[in-house]
């Protein structure tokens, strides 16, 4: 079980010594001076047949490699990610086969022998729990309501939201069958954004990104909860690389400038680096302004095989990988029974990175480097000054000659 901490739960499990801080300071500075890697990034909606279909292709070309991210809302929202060792690899789509009951082989990246890594991620269900009279930290975080299957959502035409200036597009959906009218004025959105160089978004949690990743921002806005203290979550499924599920680990930090009071970074790894990864700050927000006061605690369950129950069918995953069934799934839940929550403004937003290669690593921010320099430099200067004073004083005494 991974615990995700909001502002009231931020903590550092160890107290760094001055020598550790000094070594980190020395080791961090050179990496901050390295140049930024860039890629030529294109984003296009691939025209469907006979009607427009939501198939978004991100192609990021580097000096000797190409990354492909293929997003689709055919079935549940899903992405196929592929890395090749050539700058000439292309995506091939067989629409008649893709829209058939058996779409295996409809999606290919060519040449096939250039593929170095491939996997997929599927957002299968929107979860809702009644957290009334539930103590904090309980799992599950309340009585579950029937989940919303994202395969049974109706999605907008993503072409209308395509923004080539920011390399972003938005999938916006609501249930096809909504007898209670919970989504009459609400929607679930997946904003996908690619990057041609390293940087950080302007809004929290300000995840550090490189040209090897795309960012996904999931937002639930305006939907009516089925209880007064509903907590929401997402079920996420991925392909396992062999018999075992991918690993998830936590990284702790002493720097929280970009995500105040959040000292943790979570990663899902599809294998030993460099391979594929999913990376996120363990924090969501209940207000659009995303201030610290609206930060939500969250939890991520351990990954588990899904052989015991069927997952919603994703046509693009089956189109690329065939009939593989070694899926693993985990749940992300946002909020706690007390404190801020979705009930504040009927708003919930969470961000993550999806990438191939080495996950971006936060170096210390200039503010923290400055504080460390002052904290460690001042005692050093005092020590050096004291040593010089004693040396000069000793020299004066050694040069004194008695008049006798």
UniProtKB/Swiss-Prot annotation:
Species the sequence originates in: Rattus norvegicus
Cytoplasmic domain ranges by topology: 392-404
Record GO biological process: positive regulation of transcription by RNA polymerase II; protein localization to lysosome; protein stabilization
The protein's assembly and partners: Interacts (via lumenal domain) with lysosomal protein MFSD1; the interaction starts while both proteins are still in the endoplasmic reticulum and is required for stabilization of MFSD1 in lysosomes but has no direct effect on its targeting to lysosomes or transporter activity.
Subcellular compartments: Lysosome membrane
Placement of sequence motif Lysosomal targeting motif: 400-404
Signal sequence region: 1-35
Family in the record: Belongs to the GLMP family.
Stretches in topological domain Lumenal: 36-370
Any one GO CC term of the record: membrane
Domain of life of the source: Eukaryota
Membrane topology note: Single-pass type I membrane protein
Primary location group: membrane
Keywords for this protein: Glycoprotein, Lysosome, Membrane, Signal, Transmembrane, Transmembrane helix
Record field: transmembrane: 371-391
Protein name from the UniProt record: Glycosylated lysosomal membrane protein
Glycosylated residue positions: 64, 133, 157, 185, 228
Protein role: Required to protect lysosomal transporter MFSD1 from lysosomal proteolysis and for MFSD1 lysosomal localization.
Post-translational modification: Highly N-glycosylated. N-glycosylation is essential for GLMP stability and for MFSD1 lysosomal localization.
């Amino acid at each position: 079980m991974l615990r995700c901490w909001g502002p009231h739960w931020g903590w550092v499990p160890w107290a760094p010594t001055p020598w550790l801080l000094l070594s980190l300071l020395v080791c961090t500075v050179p990496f901050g001076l390295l140049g930024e890697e860039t890629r030529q990034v294109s984003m296009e909606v691939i025209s469907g047949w006979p009607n427009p279909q939501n198939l978004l292709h991100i192609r990021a070309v580097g000096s000797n490699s190409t990354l492909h991210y293929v997003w689709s809302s055919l079935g549940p929202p899903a992405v196929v990610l592929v890395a090749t060792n050539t700058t000439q690899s292309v995506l091939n789509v067989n629409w008649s086969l893709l829209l058939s009951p058996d779409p295996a082989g409809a999606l290919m990246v060519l040449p096939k022998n250039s593929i170095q890594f491939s996997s997929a991620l599927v957002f299968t269900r929107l979860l809702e729990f009644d957290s009334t009279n539930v103590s904090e930290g309980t799992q599950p975080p309340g009585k579950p309501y029937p989940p919303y299957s994202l395969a049974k959502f109706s999605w907008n035409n993503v072409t209308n939201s395509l923004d080539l200036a920011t390399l972003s597009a938005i999938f916006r959906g609501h249930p096809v069958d909504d007898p209670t009218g919970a989504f009459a004025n609400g929607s679930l959105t997946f904003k996908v954004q690619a990057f041609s160089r390293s940087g950080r978004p302007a809004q929290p949690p300000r995840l550090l990104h490189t040209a090897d990743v795309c960012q996904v921002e999931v937002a639930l806005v305006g939907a009516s909860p089925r209880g007064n203290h509903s907590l929401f979550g997402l079920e996420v499924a991925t392909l396992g690389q062999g018999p075992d599920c991918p690993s998830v680990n936590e990284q702790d930090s002493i720097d929280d400038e970009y995500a105040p009071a959040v000292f943790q970074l979570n990663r899902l790894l599809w294998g030993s680096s460099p391979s594929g990864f999913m990376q996120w700050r363990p924090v969501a927000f209940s207000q659009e302004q995303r201030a610290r006061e609206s930060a939500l605690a969250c939890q991520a369950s351990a990954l588990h095989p899904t052989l015991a129950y069927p997952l919603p069918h994703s046509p693009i995953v089956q189109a690329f990988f065939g009939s593989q069934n070694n899926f693993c799934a985990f749940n992300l839940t946002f909020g706690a029974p007390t404190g801020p929550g979705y009930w504040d403004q009927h708003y919930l937003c969470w961000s993550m990175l999806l990438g191939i290669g080495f996950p971006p690593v936060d170096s210390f921010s200039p503010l923290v480097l400055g504080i460390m320099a002052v904290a460690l430099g001042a005692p050093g200067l005092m020590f050096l000054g004291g040593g010089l004073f004693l040396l000069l004083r000793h020299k004066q005494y050694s040069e004194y000659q008695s008049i006798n």
